Amino acid sequence: MKIQILLATHNGEKYVEMQLDSLLAQLRRPEDQYSILISDDASDDGTPEIIRGYQERYPSIITIIPEKKSGSAMANFLRLMAASDGDVIFFCDQDDWWLPEKVIQTLEAFNSFEKPELVYSDALIADENLKTLEADERRLQTYNRGLTLQKLLVQNYIMGCTIAVNRALLDGVLRDDYPGMEMHDWWLVLYAETFGEIIHVPEKLIKYRQHSDNEVGAKDLKSMKYISSHLNGKMLRENCGNLLAQAKGFFSCYGDQMTPENAEIFRGFYTLREKNKLSRIMTQLKGGYLKSTAVRVIGQLIYM
C-alpha cells in the first residue's frame, strides 16, 4: 500500500525542518511504501532550499512538485491533491509536529479501502516551541460531539492537519472546479459524511503549533475575543452567505450521486435565503443546521 503525505509549504523556514524530521521518524509497516509529496507556494525565505536539501537526502521518499504561486493554503493543497497517487493520503501543515505513531494508528483505524473514508485524530495544542499547552477541548474548535451532515454544513469540526483519506474518497472528490469551496479539508469532510464514513481516533497524534502566522487555528470558542468577533453583523452575514454558497456548490458537483435524504438536507440548507425570516429560523432549528455554541447559533439565526 502506498502511504502518501501531502505537505504544503509557504515561508515556513522556521518550522518545516522539525516537521519533516517528524514525518521521516514515523513508525512504518514493512509492507507499505512511504512517500512525502511537497508543494511550495512561491516562498521567498529559506523554505525552498530546506525542502530541496531534504529531497536530495531522501530521494526515494520525498518528491517536490514544480513550484507555482497558489496564493493560499487551500489552492496549494488542491494542487497536491491533484498530483497525489497514494492509496492513503495524509494532509500535513508545515508548522506542526507528528507523534511517531501517527501514521500507523491512523491506518489501523480505516475500516475499508473500497468505500470513501476519512480518519481524523485529536491534537495536542502547543506553543511556538512545541511546549504543550493546557487546553479544554470542549472550548476549542477541535472538539466535537455527535457530528451530523447538518452540523458539518454550518461548521467544520475537524482539524484538517489531522486527517487522512483513502483513494476512494479522493478519486470521488477530484474535479477541475470546486464552486463555493471554503477550505479543501471541509470539502473532504462533507464528501466523507455524504458518501462514506468519518472515523475518529481519540488519541492526540500531532502537536498543533499555535502561533501568530497560523492561517486557520484551534480557536477558543468561549473567549471574549472570539465572541466579540462573531457579533460583527457584516462579517456574520458574509460568513453565512459563504456557507450557503459552499453547500450549493458542493451539491452542484455531486448532487446527482446523493441519496434522496442527503440531497434534501443540502437543498434545505442552501435555499434558506429563498424563505422568509421566520421560515429560515424554523428550518435551521428543526433541521439541526446549528453551530457549536449559543453565541454562534444566535448569530447564524439572525444573519443566515
Task: Label each PLM-derived region with a short phrase.
Residues M181, R209-M304:
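C-terminal subregions of glycosyltransferases and related glycan-biosynthesis enzymes
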Residues M1-D220:
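Nucleotide-sugar donor-binding/catalytic module of glycosyltransferases
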